[in-house]
From Swiss-Prot:
It is found in: Nucleus. The keyword Electron transport does not apply. Residues 25-35 have a biased composition (Polar residues). Signal peptide: none annotated. This is Enhancer of translation termination 1. The gene is ETT1. GO terms for biological process: positive regulation of SREBP signaling pathway; regulation of translation. The keyword Transcription regulation applies. Keywords: Nucleus, Transcription, Transcription regulation, Translation regulation. Required for correct translation termination and probably involved in regulation of hypoxic gene expression. It comes from Clavispora lusitaniae (strain ATCC 42720). It comes from the Eukaryota. Residues 1-35 are annotated as: Disordered.
Length: 426
């Protein structure tokens, strides 16, 4: 049974929205009044430590819900200034500013440059220029800091970010692999290999602090890309068939020679996503063990998000065998199998998957978010549906789900009344 992913949020749509809010940037790395940006520093950061302040500025940008091109330009401007100053001995002697370059410095520099591409998605030349400069910063950083884990993770992220903006954006349904269009799976495989390399470096050095929201962004980018490939061409088809039902998505078949065919026709990328998300969660737990009290809240939020996504992934995979079990149990009792599964096989597979989903969904619960409790209850109901009618297992599972729904319903003034009534009537 092929593993599934919850749908991505659509990086291209997000970039398009950001572009509308951005200011015009004339050339790579150029800025305007961007040095006015400031950020509140932690007490442990020295006021004259330029690189430490840059890290704080990047952290603020990454966590901001109102990201802008101006903020990125401010970061790049500061990177430019710091790098110039390291080559100017006279300027360094004129003040007491502390500058100590690191792999993290070059990683921030490169990530900021590549992020600018999302504000210029309609100008392929600019997009290519931003990525070229980003990779140049990675290369410079590698020469100075060859064992930097920060650079390895940053390079993987930049590689995967480039794919939708430079390669997928230029494709049509009738595109074919050739001199002008390459097989996109090759670029994707390279970015995944780079991520695995970064993981090995981090684990070998016991640097589990790298398992944070910023680096999880790579797995989110992969999720978005796979979602984009799954739905490739549908917007065009939907535009041609304006009378189609809203819930009916047109099915787009890609030719074997299409640059996206190898990705769309293979389950290995979904499997890789899940395996790497599970590994990320394991390493995140080690990060949490050694994190400071200040870092714990954000890491706890990230852990719940990972568990939620993994839980949803197993729920989606359970849909097919669960439907086979239901069909063979109640609607096609004379049939021996469906979709290659017997009733008993479908029952066992779906139960195993629902139980795995619950393992993660329970960890994704937030005492302040009743919806996360309901996610657990609904998964329990789905599991209960795969047990024999009126069996002890079914009754116990439904009872536990009911208790959770009652609690959530009371906490939300009846928001989940319909779900609760359906369970009790069933």
């Amino acid at each position: 049974m092929a593993p599934k992913r919850p749908l991505g949020i659509g990086k291209a749509a997000k970039a398009k929205k950001q572009k509308k809010e951005s200011t015009e940037n004339e050339s790579v790395g150029e800025t305007a009044a961007s040095n006015e940006l400031t950020v509140e520093l932690d007490e442990e950061i020295e006021a004259n430590d330029a690189v430490a302040q840059l890290k704080a500025l990047w952290k603020t940008y990454f966590a901001s819900e109102d990201k802008s091109e101006l903020m990125l330009n401010g970061i790049i401007h500061e990177c430019d200034r710091i790098l110039r100053k390291t080559h100017n001995t006279k300027e360094q002697d004129e003040d007491d500013e502390k500058i100590e370059l690191s792999g993290r410095f070059y990683a921030i520099y490169a990530l900021a440059l590549s992020s600018l591409a999302f504000y210029h998605t309609e100008d392929l030349k600019k997009v290519n220029d931003f990525f070229a400069e980003a990779f140049d910063r990675i290369e410079s950083g590698r020469k100075a800091f060859p064992d930097s884990v920060d650079l390895a993770f940053a390079e993987a992220k930049i590689m995967i970010s480039r794919i939708p903006l430079v390669e997928v954006s230029q494709l049509l349904v009738d595109s074919r692999v050739g001199k002008e269009r390459s097989d996109v799976s090759k670029s994707l495989d390279a970015s995944l290999a780079k991520w695995e390399e970064a993981q090995k470096q981090a684990v070998a050095q016991n640097h589990f602090h790298h398992y944070n929201a910023e680096n999880f962004d790579f797995l989110q980018a992969l999720d978005d890309l796979l979602d984009m490939v799954d739905n490739f061409g549908q917007e065009i088809m939907e535009g041609e068939d304006s009378d189609a039902e809203e819930d009916e998505k047109p099915h787009v078949e890609l030719d074997e020679g299409h640059p996206l065919f190898a990705i769309k026709s293979s389950d290995k990328y979904n499997l890789w996503w899940r395996e790497q998300t599970i590994a990320f969660l394991d390493h995140l737990n080690k990060n949490i063990e050694n994190a400071s009290a200040k870092e714990l809240p954000a890491l706890a939020v990230l852990k719940r998000e990972l568990c939620k996504r993994l839980g949803q992934s197993y729920l989606m995979e359970a849909e097919v065998p669960a439907n086979v079990f239901t069909t063979l149990s109640y609607y096609s009792k004379d049939a021996k199998s469906l979709n290659g599964l017997t009733r008993v096989e479908a029952q066992k597979i779906s139960q195993d998957l629902f139980k795995r989903a619950l393992t993660y969904l329970k960890q994704a619960q937030d005492e302040q978010e009743p919806e996360t409790w309901v996610n657990v209850a609904e998964a329990m109901i789905s599991l209960g549906n795969t047990y024999e009618i009126d069996s002890k297992e079914q009754e116990e599972t439904y009872k536990e789900a009911e208790a959770i729904l009652v609690k959530a319903n009371n906490a939300t003034n009846g928001k989940y009344e319909d779900i609760l009534e359906n369970l009790m009537q069933g």
